[in-house]
Amino acid sequence: VIQDVDRSAGKLVMATNAAFKPYEYYDGGSIIGLDVDMMHAICDKLGMSLEIEDIEFDAIINAVQSGKADVGVAGMTVTEDRLKSIDFTNSYTTSKQVIIVKDENASVQKMSFAEKLKENFITDNRWQYIAKGLLNTIIITVFAIIIGIVLGFLIAIIRTSHDKNGGFTILNFICRLYLTIVRGTPVMVQLLIIYFVIFASVDISKIVVAIIAFGLNSAAYVAEVVRSGIMAVDEGQFEAGRSLGLNYKQTMMSIILPQAVKNILPALCNEFISLLKETSISGYIGLMDLTKGGDIIRSVTYEAFMPLIA
């Protein structure tokens, strides 16, 4: 990288999958490689700064098509199907495919557990990938479950009110449509649509996108959990509240919901655990989560066991 180049022309966003040595890979916490060096040279020529987005290989073309990235560089093979969607530069390297087999006579130096631990986490401070991924995972899960609980309770109250007294007809229809769509589609599809379609032209933090996506997904499941908890409360509790002079809102807030919450707490805890595990797909939009951190370490050390245990 030439340090004294005027980079006032803006930035060039490069989408890649940094697990393909020697073209793009992690070293010392940074993404380097032949492709990266080439893109730095292009940016030096154009007077632009380079921003590298490490995302899943399958999402690179989507990132370019949606405008989230200006170029995709990841050792792609030119195919007829891909040419229908994107433009390729002239090929600047050729490679050949080989098949590898196990050599029974080869001598392999086995590493001790301590050596594997050092190689996977201590060398080049690779533990930081796990630490950063864990922090992002916790942040996404906590804020997403907050959105899920707040929106889920609101949807549950609207649907329950409609079932009991026929109110909120239009809102109930919207809520039912929302629940059908969200619960009937994979969360990965929802995440990709929100990032590459809805926020395609918006410069927004990936963590915020993940929080919104997982929060909206969680709300659909929380809503039905809360609704079942409300419906499980004996109808006599409603009648008792109304006989005491309380209106519907007061009865719901003071008598019904406290009992419903007590009944659904185990289910809400299960939803939190499920949401924590669902965040493992955040790497598809280039977000460093816990799973992505392990993938980066595994791509460098080729050790499958240790990163997964972490």
Predicted regions and their residues:
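N-terminal, intrinsically disordered, polar/charged segments of Gram-positive cell-envelope systems
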Residues: 1-10, 106-114, 118-119
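Short secondary-structure boundary/capping segments
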Residues: 3-5, 88-91, 200-201, 273
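Structural motif corresponding to alpha-helix initiation and N-cap regions
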Residues: 57-58, 82, 175
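Flexible loop residues that form catalytic
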Residues: 76-77, 193
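A bilobed periplasmic-binding-protein/Venus flytrap-type ligand-binding module shared by bacterial periplasmic
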Residues: 97-107, 123
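Transmembrane alpha-helices and adjacent helix-loop boundaries
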Residues: 109-310
